[in-house]
Amino acid sequence: MNEKDNQTTSEPENEQEIIDVNDSGEQPEENETEQPQEEAVENDEIAKLQQEKDETYNRLVRLQAEFDNYKRRTLKEREADRKYKSQDLITELLPAIDNFERALQVEVTEENKSIIDGIMMVYRQLQEALTSQGVEPIKTEGEVFDPNLHHAVMQIEDENMDSNTVVEELQKGYQLKDRVIRPAMVKVNK
């Protein structure tokens, strides 16, 4: 009997061992339900961080584009300032040049020859200075009237001339490089 008692007592131990194995098998099921919840929370955090990263990147790209546009714009403005820096001074000098041209239209006599020669030298120096800065007179007589370059003061009818043609220049116009600083005052054929 002792052997039977030993056998019966050993059986429950095996059952407990089996139960223990089953008990340990149930715990992973609880962990499995916790893991998807943790993964869902982690995925939400990852999605939020990804969205923040994308927004920050887009903001950075926009700021970089704005900065590049700013650099280009300021460079163009500096170039324009450099190109036309002398425009104000030239505009102030044009009436003096007009007066020199009127003085040179006076009839030369023995008495005023030296004065006219002096005026001519100063006038040439002024013209050279203007040319060195990129100032050119606007072509007028015989040219087709261009409202961007010419200011029509008078109109005449001449059958020998083409219509809309500049007949006479009344006051010289000037351009600084590609910009008109004073349009030419002209008489135009109808």
From Swiss-Prot:
This is Protein GrpE. GO terms for molecular function: adenyl-nucleotide exchange factor activity; protein homodimerization activity; protein-folding chaperone binding; unfolded protein binding. Participates actively in the response to hyperosmotic and heat shock by preventing the aggregation of stress-denatured proteins, in association with DnaK and GrpE. It is the nucleotide exchange factor for DnaK and may function as a thermosensor. Unfolded proteins bind initially to DnaJ; upon interaction with the DnaJ-bound protein, DnaK hydrolyzes its bound ATP, resulting in the formation of a stable complex. GrpE releases ADP from DnaK; ATP binding to DnaK triggers the release of the substrate protein, thus completing the reaction cycle. Homodimer. One of its GO terms (biological process) is protein folding. InterPro entries: GrpE (IPR000740), GrpE_coiled_coil (IPR013805), GrpE_head (IPR009012). Residues 26-42 have a biased composition (Acidic residues). Belongs to the GrpE family. It comes from the Bacteria. It is found in: Cytoplasm. Residues 1-42 are annotated as: Disordered. One of its GO terms (cellular component) is cytoplasm. Pfam families: GrpE (PF01025). Keywords: Chaperone, Cytoplasm, Stress response. HAMAP family: GrpE (MF_01151).
